[in-house]
Amino acid sequence: MHKYRTHTCGELNLAHVGLQVKLSGWLYRRRDHGGLLFIDLRDHYGIIQLVFNDDCSIIQAEISKIKFETVITVEGTVIARSNETINKNISTGDVEVVVSSYVVESFAEELPLQINGEYEAPEETRLKYRFLDLRGARLHQNIVLRSKVIQELRNQMLSNGFIEFQTPILTASSPEGARDFLVPSRLHPGKFYALPQAPQQFKQLIMMSGFDKYFQIAPCFRDEDARADRSPGEFYQLDIEMAFVTQEDVFGLVEPVLYNTFKKFSNYSITDIPFPRITYDESMLRYGSDKPDLRNPIQISDVTDIFQCSEFTTLKDSINCGAVVRAIPAPMSANRPRSFFDKMIEYAKHLGASGLAYIQFTNDGVKGSIAKFFDEALLARIKKLVKCQDGDAIFFICDKEDDATKVAAKIRAKVGEELNIIKTDCYKFCWVIDFPFYQLDSEVNKITFSHNPFSMPQGGIEAFNKAKTVEDLLSIKAFQYDIVCNGVELSSGAIRNHKPDLMYKAFAIAGYSKDEVDKQFGAMIRAFSYGAPPHGGIAPGIDRILMLLTNSVNIREVIAFPMNQQAEDLLMGAPSAVTEKQLQELQLKLISKERIK
């Protein structure tokens, strides 16, 4: 018989009745029924109930004093449970093991957190004792699922003819949107490596190298603040790049990969292929976001022109000063009590809006705070444009375009929540396309890249040459696209700019000199000068895919050893101080913030 186990704790069933077995695992739960002591033994594979009967009174006395999570090995006989004691909640619930002997492999101290799920410990405790937290069923299953999802993604890429690469972790710093993590060089004092924010340049260089289809389960490192869906420091993505492809070719690859993955690991309904394509401008108008949650059926409309024809003088004055009016329908809520509308108004004020107007299209006529300012013809125009019917209400927000867009998005989400019309058992995918190539940094009044600076501008270099004003430049679109699911951006991608003259021009408009471009992107520019294929790619975030599949509200629930909100690893004590000797080897010296000032 094996030293530790003949079977796992999750595999025993009625076919094993009468068998002598040896099992090892953690002491999970204990129940004393007076003469009979029941222990739930847990390992990676499941839970089995152990029985210590009164024939083993000495063993009972010993085992009853052992702390939870102590690791034990037991020998015993598998028996069938009586009908009234069968446990349908576990895979081994038809049987139990009558123990004849046991050995303690490792004693456990008093636990700082409970494993059996009776209450959840504070996050600081969970992260400090992550090895204990990972024993809990939900988190344990999430990490197992993570492995399966990565395997599924890898298998699909290989079946599509892709080659898996590993690109360098120590590389050069480049301006890709977030701060770099820097690594000082011992051999080259005063110089630093950077951990890659993404393998962006390397995967494009792989296309320059004559490879046709690249993928990588890629670690990415960004020194940025944490969010619920963003881990500080490190995250993983399915990095993809292909040569001689159009935007639609990329979509044609990614859609089945995501569809098949979500179909395999969830029973939710999934958007049929092809996924909807929504332009950036339409997304910002209809949903107030470039990450639309299509589970919410409400769409926002612009009704500025109609309001300008109304008798609503206050709003007309605002419109003449540059404001816009957005309409947010509230289906079948016209007859809701006044408290509903007051609640929405207070919510809008909480968001920073000066107020929130509304109209109710009831069966008895039109009501609401601003209905009196519109004649029947204008009301009919509003109703048609917003696609409302009798029984619906409409909320209106008036503000500068950026502010109106943000508030309307929040109101849309709140109305959907209040009316309980947001579906929860589906995955709604879409592509957001035609992003602006540039944006205006209002703080410094400077044109900057809105997304990836390596994207191909629609219209090529002619689009730059035709642009005579800032507005013309801001109207240029990129072959840039995002894949969004349930309001979560899973990935950005693009058809790349593979022409040196076009790249220099694009960077020059954003304020970069040729020397700066050569210094920061010299390797790629050189590669472009020796025959570069048209190419494009994308990189779906694996952590966010897992969040959706597990219904997790925080990305830390799908990562084995995450950092906290302050980018600290409480388990390992990182970041940590280093010795003076280590600093000397790197020719570095620490100085206080006061001295920097």
UniProtKB/Swiss-Prot annotation:
<dbReference type="InterPro" id="IPR006195">
    <property type="entry name" value="aa-tRNA-synth_II"/>
</dbReference>
<dbReference type="GO" id="GO:0003676">
    <property type="term" value="F:nucleic acid binding"/>
</dbReference>
<dbReference type="Pfam" id="PF02938">
    <property type="entry name" value="GAD"/>
</dbReference>
<dbReference type="InterPro" id="IPR047090">
    <property type="entry name" value="AspRS_core"/>
</dbReference>
<keyword id="KW-0067">ATP-binding</keyword>
<comment type="function">
    <text>Aspartyl-tRNA synthetase with relaxed tRNA specificity since it is able to aspartylate not only its cognate tRNA(Asp) but also tRNA(Asn). Reaction proceeds in two steps: L-aspartate is first activated by ATP to form Asp-AMP and then transferred to the acceptor end of tRNA(Asp/Asn).</text>
</comment>
<feature type="site" description="Important for tRNA non-discrimination">
    <location>
        <position position="33"/>
    </location>
</feature>
<dbReference type="InterPro" id="IPR012340">
    <property type="entry name" value="NA-bd_OB-fold"/>
</dbReference>
<feature type="binding site">
    <location>
        <position position="222"/>
    </location>
    <ligand>
        <name>L-aspartate</name>
    </ligand>
</feature>
<dbReference type="GO" id="GO:0006422">
    <property type="term" value="P:aspartyl-tRNA aminoacylation"/>
</dbReference>
<dbReference type="InterPro" id="IPR004365">
    <property type="entry name" value="NA-bd_OB_tRNA"/>
</dbReference>
<feature type="binding site">
    <location>
        <position position="489"/>
    </location>
    <ligand>
        <name>ATP</name>
    </ligand>
</feature>
<dbReference type="InterPro" id="IPR029351">
    <property type="entry name" value="GAD_dom"/>
</dbReference>
<dbReference type="GO" id="GO:0005524">
    <property type="term" value="F:ATP binding"/>
</dbReference>
<dbReference type="InterPro" id="IPR045864">
    <property type="entry name" value="aa-tRNA-synth_II/BPL/LPL"/>
</dbReference>
<feature type="binding site">
    <location>
        <begin position="541"/>
        <end position="544"/>
    </location>
    <ligand>
        <name>ATP</name>
    </ligand>
</feature>
<keyword id="KW-0547">Nucleotide-binding</keyword>
<dbReference type="InterPro" id="IPR004364">
    <property type="entry name" value="Aa-tRNA-synt_II"/>
</dbReference>
<feature type="binding site">
    <location>
        <position position="451"/>
    </location>
    <ligand>
        <name>L-aspartate</name>
    </ligand>
</feature>
<dbReference type="InterPro" id="IPR004115">
    <property type="entry name" value="GAD-like_sf"/>
</dbReference>
<dbReference type="InterPro" id="IPR004524">
    <property type="entry name" value="Asp-tRNA-ligase_1"/>
</dbReference>
<dbReference type="InterPro" id="IPR002312">
    <property type="entry name" value="Asp/Asn-tRNA-synth_IIb"/>
</dbReference>
<keyword id="KW-0030">Aminoacyl-tRNA synthetase</keyword>
<feature type="binding site">
    <location>
        <begin position="222"/>
        <end position="224"/>
    </location>
    <ligand>
        <name>ATP</name>
    </ligand>
</feature>
<protein>
    <recommendedName>
        <fullName>Aspartate--tRNA(Asp/Asn) ligase</fullName>
        <ecNumber>6.1.1.23</ecNumber>
    </recommendedName>
</protein>
<dbReference type="InterPro" id="IPR047089">
    <property type="entry name" value="Asp-tRNA-ligase_1_N"/>
</dbReference>
<dbReference type="GO" id="GO:0050560">
    <property type="term" value="F:aspartate-tRNA(Asn) ligase activity"/>
</dbReference>
<keyword id="KW-0963">Cytoplasm</keyword>
<comment type="similarity">
    <text>Belongs to the class-II aminoacyl-tRNA synthetase family. Type 1 subfamily.</text>
</comment>
<keyword id="KW-0648">Protein biosynthesis</keyword>
<dbReference type="GO" id="GO:0004815">
    <property type="term" value="F:aspartate-tRNA ligase activity"/>
</dbReference>
<feature type="binding site">
    <location>
        <position position="176"/>
    </location>
    <ligand>
        <name>L-aspartate</name>
    </ligand>
</feature>
<dbReference type="Pfam" id="PF00152">
    <property type="entry name" value="tRNA-synt_2"/>
</dbReference>
<keyword id="KW-0436">Ligase</keyword>
<feature type="region of interest" description="Aspartate">
    <location>
        <begin position="200"/>
        <end position="203"/>
    </location>
</feature>
<feature type="binding site">
    <location>
        <position position="496"/>
    </location>
    <ligand>
        <name>L-aspartate</name>
    </ligand>
</feature>
<comment type="subunit">
    <text>Homodimer.</text>
</comment>
<dbReference type="Pfam" id="PF01336">
    <property type="entry name" value="tRNA_anti-codon"/>
</dbReference>
<dbReference type="GO" id="GO:0005737">
    <property type="term" value="C:cytoplasm"/>
</dbReference>
